[in-house]
Each structure stands twice: as structure tokens, then as C-alpha cells.
């Protein structure tokens, strides 16, 4: 991968959080949490709307991270990419009707030799997602591993 792109921040990507998308996500993850699955219950709650589960971050961040995957200058070998790790710092709750704006920054590219003597590259990215009021909803750190080839 192209080391010169460390520090690059990609354009902001906006995501409109729809109630149906939250319902779909909740069904896919087998959630029974009424804040995420029951419109009437959630509307009467102190949130006033259907609430996205914390892991919904993958939905709105994925669109922003596509810029990284599609960046030809980065020269990422996408078929060799596997998930390394991720960490999150959550802020405001994400609700249906919110507009989430996410930026992605490449914070590091590290080369490490694996046990087979092949060179893996670790791509470390950070995301920052704000709601329509400019409030932080999530900061993420994502590590992807490009497995070394022969």
C-alpha cells in the first residue's frame, strides 16, 4: 500500500438514518430490543424515535470507508484484505431521522512479517461521525490486514 497516503482524509459522506434500515439491521442481528424493533415503544420513550443499535456504526461508516477501498492511489489488494480489529468511542445515540456525516482518515500503514515470512500490511483508519447537530455519535479505529502474498 502507498505509505504516502498516511494522513489523508477522505471527503465527508452523509447517511440518512431510516427507521426501516434500523429495523432491517435489528432483524439481521436477531435483536429483540424494543428501542430498535418497536416503533410505538420507541416513539413513547425519552428518545422519541427508533434507536439504532451501537453496532449500526458499521452501516454508516461503511459508505465512507468505500472511498478508501476504491482509492486506486492507495493500491490496496482488496481480495487479500481481512479484518484485524476495531474499537469505538460512542457519543450521542443515533436515531431514525438523523443525518450522520462521517470522515475517514488513514492514520498508519505498517508492514509486519508473519510466521511464514510473508509481509503483511496493516491499514489503520479512523472515522469520526457526527449527527446533524454537529454532535459526535462515534469515533472508530479500524485495522485491516492485507495478507502477504508469495
Residue ranges, per PLM feature:
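HotDog/MaoC-like acyl-thioester-processing domains
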Residues: 1, 90-150
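Hot-dog-fold acyl-thioester-processing enzymes
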Residues: 1-85
Amino acid at each position: 500500500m502507498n505509505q504516502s497516503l498516511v494522513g489523508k482524509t477522505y471527503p465527508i459522506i452523509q447517511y440518512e438514518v431510516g427507521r426501516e434500515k434500523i429495523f432491517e439491521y435489528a432483524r439481521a442481528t436477531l435483536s429483540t430490543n424494543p428501542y430498535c424493533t418497536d416503533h410505538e415503544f420507541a416513539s413513547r420513550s425519552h428518545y422519541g424515535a427508533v434507536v439504532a443499535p451501537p453496532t449500526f456504526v458499521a452501516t454508516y461508516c461503511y459508505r465512507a470507508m468505500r472511498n478508501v477501498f476504491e482509492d486506486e492511489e492507495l493500491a490496496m489488494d482488496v481480495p487479500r484484505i481481512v479484518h484485524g480489529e476495531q474499537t469505538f468511542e460512542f457519543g450521542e445515540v443515533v436515531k431514525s431521522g438523523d443525518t450522520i456525516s462521517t470522515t475517514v482518515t488513514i492514520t498508519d500503514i505498517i508492514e509486519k512479517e508473519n510466521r511464514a515470512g510473508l509481509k503483511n500490511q496493516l491499514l489503520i483508519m479512523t472515522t469520526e461521525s457526527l449527527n446533524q447537530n454537529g454532535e459526535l455519535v462515534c469515533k472508530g479505529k479500524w485495522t485491516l490486514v492485507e495478507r502477504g502474498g508469495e
